[in-house]
Structures are given as structure tokens and as C-alpha cells.
């Protein structure tokens, strides 16, 4: 079962990356739970809820209308109804500048679906 769950989580991560790269904010927030809480690599304040998350994504797109978000070397750990995805990420901006970092998504099973209840992104040092 863990392999199947891992595949589901990785599919959600790929779908989110595709949505971000297409500027599709509803698609980018689709895998997140309504009660989502997280930390961004660009602001110190905690992000709470889907509206705040959508606002954060819109801020990124306002700064660089064309960007390419990628995740590399993802790993998924499954523990019952919780799964944790850790990965390295990069964002290439329209200017050609690339930003690198690390990310964690904590997923919880909600019925038959997996939803992100927490994320933590940080830039590489």
C-alpha cells in the first residue's frame, strides 16, 4: 500500500508543479486542505488557509508572470493516514535567475483523497 500511496503523492506534486507553471492558481491549491497552515521561503509570517495560499501564489506570479517550478529528488514517507513528501525545489524566473530550496509537504488522508495540511519551504544556503 505504501508504494501506491507514494505514487499518489508524487502524482499530486507533479500536478501542482504543472499548475504553477501554467499560472493556474486554483489548480496549484487543489491538493491543499481547507485548514492548511504553512511557511513560505519568501515571508516570515505563517500562511493560513486556501485564500492566503492563493494570495501567496498570485504574489509570485505578479513578480514573475513566467516562471518554471520544479521539484527534484522527492521522497515520500507513509505512516498510516499521514504522508510526508520532502524534496528539493527550484524556480526559474522570467529574468533567468534560478532560486533553489528545500520543501516539505505533510499530507493527511481525507476520505479517499490526500490533502496537504502543512508545508514548509526554505531557500538553500
Spans of features found by a protein language model:
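A beta-strand edge to alpha-helix "cap/lid" segment located at domain peripheries
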Residues: 1-30, 37-125
